[in-house]
Amino acid sequence: MTADGRPRIPTGILGEAPIRELEIALAGSIVGPGEPNYETARQVWNNAIDKRPALIVRAASTEDVARTIAFARRVGQPIAVRGGAHSAAGFSTCDHGIVIDLAQLNDVQVDVGSRRALAGGGSTWKIFDAATQAYGLATTGGLVSSTGLEHWSRWLRAWRRCRPSGPEVRPHVRQPSVRRVGDR
């Protein structure tokens, strides 16, 4: 809410109460049409893609992701997940739906003993390389430093440039809960 009590985000088709409820539940923030930073927040790498989401949720935790997915299901809105915002086809954004921006989930934890790294969904190759190179480790990805890790991972596995064990994945399924799936 603004100082004068008006909704901070134009509510459009979603309604004020559901958006306010989501905003209170999140550790991250919400950006909507009409806000000063909306135009910048909705941009993706491919300038030919000009979509206007109803909301952009800047997730600060995996719980924010789960809550946003549950919210989108409840209000019947499509979602797009943005990691590095490098989808040439525009899959990291949507018109009139909800974009879950993972940029803040960019931590990288390196286990030197096993020579593995666990990276957040918003990690870019620049962040990943800096974390792994500190331990003398390198990877087969990262052709463009601002590209999100998810952008290349499926292609690299297809070309057998990555180890078949692959990364750990934390899918968000029917229930608004976080599940952890790993290869070991």
Model-derived segments and spans:
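N-terminal accessory segments
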Residues: 1-165
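Active-site and channel-lining beta-strand-loop segments
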Residues: 108-109, 166-184
